[in-house]
């Protein structure tokens, strides 16, 4: 076995070496537990091993799979951006690229004046929730007591 490292750097994120590999990978934004388990299986690694025992070659293999998971055999339904709006490819975005893509999607909806974009603009719920009692913003007004 390789030397144990308490912090392992994968895809620009520090992972806890004491956790199981599949749980450690969930620290990367855009990678959930199911996707992390798939990445481990495709890379030929035990998802239950401690992340601190990863070698540099194994880290590189994981990073390659995270860059293009569909090409490495992960199914299309598992990626977080199927049929990308601009390219039409099945992508799986992680970390800053994921944040940027979400921000660009919201800006596109606002620019074309779609209903969802207008709701985002106004700071209202976007997915059909009711607004009578929830989603109130700002400071609450307390109840004043009567003077005796």
From Swiss-Prot:
GO terms for biological process: translation. One of its GO terms (molecular function) is rRNA binding. It comes from the Archaea. SUPFAM superfamilies: S13-like H2TH domain (SSF46946). GO terms for cellular component: cytosol; small ribosomal subunit. Pfam families: Ribosomal_S13. Keywords: Ribonucleoprotein, Ribosomal protein, RNA-binding, rRNA-binding. Located at the top of the head of the 30S subunit, it contacts several helices of the 16S rRNA. In the 70S ribosome it contacts the 23S rRNA (bridge B1a) and protein L5 of the 50S subunit (bridge B1b), connecting the 2 subunits; these bridges are implicated in subunit movement. Part of the 30S ribosomal subunit. Forms a loose heterodimer with protein S19. Forms two bridges to the 50S subunit in the 70S ribosome. Belongs to the universal ribosomal protein uS13 family. This is Small ribosomal subunit protein uS13. It comes from Pyrococcus abyssi (strain GE5 / Orsay). The gene is rps13.
């Amino acid at each position: 076995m390789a030397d144990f490292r308490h912090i392992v750097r994968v895809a620009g994120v520090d992972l806890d070496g004491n956790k199981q590999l599949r749980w450690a990978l969930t620290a990367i934004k855009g990678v959930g537990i199911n996707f992390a388990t798939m990445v481990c299986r495709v890379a030929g690694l035990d998802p239950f091993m401690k992340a601190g025992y990863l070698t540099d070659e194994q880290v590189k293999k994981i990073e390659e799979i995270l860059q293009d998971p569909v090409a490495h055999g992960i199914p299309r339904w598992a990626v977080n951006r199927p049929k990308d709006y601009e390219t039409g490819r099945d992508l799986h975005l992680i970390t800053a690229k994921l944040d940027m893509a979400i921000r660009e999607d919201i800006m596109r909806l606002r620019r074309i004046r779609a209903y969802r974009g207008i709701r985002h603009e106004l700071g209202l719920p976007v997915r059909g929730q009711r607004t009578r009692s929830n989603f109130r913003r700002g400071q609450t007004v307390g109840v004043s007591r009567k003077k005796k």
